[in-house]
Amino acid sequence: MSIITFFQQLFAQPLTQKQIFAEDVSKINSLEKAIQQSELVVNYLLQEHYTPSISICVTKRGFPIWEHGYGYADIEQKVPVNTRETLYRIASVSKPLTGLSLTKMQEQGWIDWNCSLYDYVPYFPKKEYDFTVKQLAGHLAGIRAYKGKEVLLNRFMSIKEGIGVFSQDPLLFEPGTQYYYNSYDFNLVSLAMQEAKKEPFEWYVTHNVLEPLGMYHTFPDMGGLSPNQSIPYMTDKKKQFKRTSDVNNFFKLGGGGFLSTAYDVNLMGQAILGKAF
């Protein structure tokens, strides 16, 4: 389906940026008006950035006040978006989920994040400097980021096998001296957790974080297309939507490999903000 046809079906008239931001949002004093204005922004973003779908869940004091899906999870079949059931690749939003899990494991005494990674993963090739699990979680260890097409890998690898993608590379800097955001830090964090607890990382996350928080629609991305998952699209030179190439993100589960819904991610956010979990 062409992008033009898709958005003609979604919206009767195109919106301009001037129309969207004409109103002073500080003067909005009702939920209904706030949602109306927000929907203008959402619709503009859908058109401007050629986004097939958006799933939104907003809560206030722990209760949902706005849940809605826009666009289609499957364009050709016109499958609507359900905020509580439609799965998306949440990419690096997997990191705070791993962070919650690491904190829970630290509280339970299964791991000490101030210890060297090598206390838990002694088979990781030695580097010029030692570094701790905590430094990995804070992106302070000097591990490199993706190279080339590593982000598009489409073969199943376990978390342990996955560290082979970067294990032979040197550190970028002495740990603790610089900040460098990357996903491979969390490959090592999740592997350290797995070795410390002597059970699969995803099992621990499920039983100690997902289930207690009621995140029943959050799963590891095992490759392919899972039931209820929104189809990942890209656009070609002819402005046509087409399905992206398959990838398998399981090897980087802790840093960018979970599937989830808007509602579940909202539950995680509440747990982080509430500081009670």
Regions found by a protein language model. Give the residues of each.
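Bacterial Sec-dependent N-terminal signal peptides
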Residues: 1-14
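Acidic/histidine-rich, surface-exposed loop or edge segments in extracytoplasmic proteins
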Residues: 15-27
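Short, low-complexity N-terminal intrinsically disordered segments enriched in polar/charged residues
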Residues: 25-30, 256
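Residue-level marker of regulatory loop/turn positions in helix-turn-helix DNA-binding domains and
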Residues: 34, 82, 90, 125, ...
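Active-site SXXK
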Residues: 36, 42, 56, 62, ...
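Short, surface-exposed loop or secondary-structure junction motifs
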Residues: 74, 128-277
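Short, well-structured active-site flanking segments
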Residues: 77, 85, 97, 103-122, ...
